[in-house]
């Protein structure tokens, strides 16, 4: 490029220098701004003490709610299982009385009664050893009567030998009888004391004896 004079050349060079200076300055400034922004984004913001307390309370509430939910679920399942067990006991109790009242028992009925007798004897054997010899003798007597009833039922009989058996109505002791009867004569550890008290009644499960048992008539 040719210049007419030195003055025009100087002016042109000065203009070019200003342009380059402006361009370079702007680029440097934009880079520094972007770096400062990236640094500010990378640094985590400090959490205030109030926010920390709120977070802790929320965590505690969540844990408490989970524990309450688990506790409610456990109690609900426990109630359901208890209801199902009571219904099962009642159903077996009805089945036992229905079979026992039959004059002509089928082979399946006899097998069911025989199974009850065996289970009751096994349950009596599982009771802890009793120091009272009198109660021990009564338990042995019950076992013998259970075996005799088993033989008598197997021959088609409907009642124990040696006397007439009368049926009592299920009044106040109905719930107790159903609770103690499980259809297979299993005796829970919580009822052992009651079994000892009622052990003088012959028949199947001692808890059932008051329903069907009555002293011989003097007639």
UniProtKB/Swiss-Prot annotation:
Chain residue ranges for the region called Disordered: 27-79, 186-219
Keyword list, A-Z: Nucleus, Transcription, Transcription regulation
Subcellular location per the Swiss-Prot or TrEMBL entry: Nucleus, Nucleolus
InterPro entries associated with the record: Rrt14
Major site of localization recorded for this protein: nucleus
Any one Pfam family match given in the protein's UniProt record, by short name: RRT14
GO cellular component: nucleolus
Skewed-composition ranges (Basic residues): 34-44, 69-79
Entry superkingdom: Eukaryota
Family: Belongs to the RRT14 family.
Biological function: Involved in ribosome biogenesis, probably through modulation of rDNA transcription.
Protein name, UniProt field: Regulator of rDNA transcription 14
Species for this entry: Candida albicans (strain SC5314 / ATCC MYA-2876) (Yeast)
Gene expressing this chain: RRT14
């Amino acid at each position: 490029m040719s210049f007419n004079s030195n003055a025009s050349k100087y002016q042109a060079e000065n203009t070019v220098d200003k342009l380059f200076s402006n361009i370079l300055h702007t680029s440097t400034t934009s880079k520094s701004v972007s770096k400062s922004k990236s640094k500010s984004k990378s640094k985590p913001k400090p959490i205030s003490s109030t926010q920390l307390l709120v977070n802790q309370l929320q965590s505690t509430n969540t844990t408490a709610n989970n524990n309450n939910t688990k506790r409610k679920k456990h109690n609900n399942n426990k109630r359901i299982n208890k209801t199902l067990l009571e219904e099962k006991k009642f159903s077996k109790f009805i089945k036992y009385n229905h079979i026992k009242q039959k004059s002509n028992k089928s082979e399946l009925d006899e097998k069911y009664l025989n199974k009850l007798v065996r289970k009751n004897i096994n349950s009596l054997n599982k009771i802890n050893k009793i120091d009272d010899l009198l109660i021990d003798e009564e338990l042995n007597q019950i076992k013998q009567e259970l075996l005799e009833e088993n033989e008598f039922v197997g021959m088609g009989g409907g009642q124990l030998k040696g006397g007439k058996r009368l049926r009592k109505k299920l009044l106040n002791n109905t719930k107790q009888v159903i609770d103690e009867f499980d259809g297979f004569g299993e005796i829970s550890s919580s009822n052992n004391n009651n079994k000892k008290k009622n052990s003088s009644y012959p028949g199947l499960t001692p808890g059932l004896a008051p329903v069907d048992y009555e002293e011989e008539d003097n007639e």
